[in-house]
Amino acid sequence: MNDPHLLIDAGNSRIKWALADARRTLVDTGAFGHTRDGGADPDWSALPRPHGAWISNVAGADVAARLDALLDACWPGLPRTTIRSQPAQCGVTNGYTTPDQLGSDRWAGLIGARAAFPGEHLLIATFGTATTLEALRADGRFTGGLIAPGWALMMRALGTHTAQLPTLTTDIASGLLAGAQAEPFQVDTPRSLSAGCLYAQAGLIERAWRDLADAWQAPVRLVLAGGAADDVARALTLPHTRHDALILSGLALIAAEGAAQD
């Protein structure tokens, strides 16, 4: 089967897509908002008709309906598969006690990470609306994870639920901290809030990495992904690897496995 696969990652903040060729290479990519207010619709008119669409959607029913409408407008009747976490798939074994409770984005990311770093123990940190951590052993066993508020959500919660603290976006906070992160403590409220929430992210990652390395008594590669990864990386004292296509790469593997079974 040489037809490309359309891959869609509908996250809590935006929707990313890619077209994967027969070698699972992402040959076209893009992103758009949950609604038209979040930006223009994707222009898929120049793309070849794909074999089908494989979708990870953690954004809910309204986004699912929007995706269906976009796909039907471009390719009426295109087969589509909305993935769910499985007990085992593409070389990864799901360690959740109830496997289908694991978010489909995290599942696809685990599959993508195992393919990107075969034979390595991994801690995968993804920075979105939530910050998620996944522990993946070299043999493909996902042993569990952690979920915390993301950097933006932490700052928004403080601004919303206090009388005197500002509500800061990550763009504002990143600008405030440019050149200021070398100082361990900040000297005004906006920078103190920005740095405190950022260091909370970094501290979580470093504690989890050390606990994992101690528990496994082996080297663990730290892999960072997601929108706030650059900012969090500057606050880390650990070596790390950046990879921003784990979910789409995992979807490409799931799509290839599914197409081979057709």
Curated annotation (Swiss-Prot):
InterPro entries: ATPase_NBD, Type_III_PanK. Pfam families: Pan_kinase. One of its GO terms (cellular component) is cytoplasm. Substrate binds at Y96, G103, S104, D105, R106, T189. The active site is at D105 (proton acceptor). NCBIfam families: baf, PRK13328.1-4. Signal peptide: none annotated. Keywords: ATP-binding, Coenzyme A biosynthesis, Cytoplasm, Kinase, Nucleotide-binding, Potassium, Transferase. Catalyzes the phosphorylation of pantothenate (Pan), the first step in CoA biosynthesis. It comes from the Bacteria. This is Type III pantothenate kinase. Gene3D superfamilies: 3.30.420.40. It comes from Burkholderia ambifaria (strain ATCC BAA-244 / DSM 16087 / CCUG 44356 / LMG 19182 / AMMD) (Burkholderia cepacia (strain AMMD)). The gene is coaX.
